[in-house]
Amino acid sequence: MKIVLAAINAKYIHANLAIYSLRAFSDEYKEQIQIKEYTINQYTELLHQLRPEMPVWFGGPEVSYDAAECLQRNHGVTGILRGEGEESFHELMQYYIGGSGKLQDIRGIIYREDGLLVDNGWREVMDLNKVPFVYEEMEDFKNKIIYYETSRGCPFSCSYCLSSV
């Protein structure tokens, strides 16, 4: 099985730190993980029609905020990783690629099962020291703007913004 990590609305010159963190955190599955940066949300329904057996997962603050509503609007999406996704993503890799574990045991996800939404709750905030350095192979970032995180989210929790989620 191949895993594609796709950044929504990523520009050519911007590297999406989140998807590189997911790949780095699940290093033992690196050969199965491909990174694509383009607008995927418009293609999920088409992907579902062409390959209904292929799981499609979303993640990030935009979908974490109201994950159930997002799943109801996007029938081609299997589930959503909510909040910080590295540990949940790693467990999804163990489930799909390694053949171990159960979806109902993975904290931080909401997904479809037999037409119903199953909400496993939010995962605890992780220790950022566990996330490996993502820029080991700098040739992947030639002519791109790269990002460094010194903290997660925004501390201000403005009512109109999802960056603090």
Residue ranges and their predicted role:
Residues 7-9, 37-39, 165:
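Residue-level recognition of beta-strand->loop/alpha-helix junctions
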Residues 6, 57-59, 149:
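A cross-family glycoside hydrolase active-site/sugar-binding cleft signature
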Residues 31:
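Gly/serine-rich nucleotide phosphate-binding loop at the start of the catalytic core
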Residues 2, 18, 22-26, 34-124:
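Glycine-rich beta-alpha loop elements in corrinoid/cobalamin-binding modules
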Residues 129-165:
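Radical SAM [4Fe-4S] cluster-binding motif and immediate context
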Residues 10-19:
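Glycine- and acidic-residue-enriched helix-capping/strand-helix junction motifs
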Residues 14-15, 66, 130, 135:
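Secondary-structure boundary/capping motif
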Residues 1-11:
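Nucleotide-activated donor-dependent transferases that construct or modify glycoconjugates
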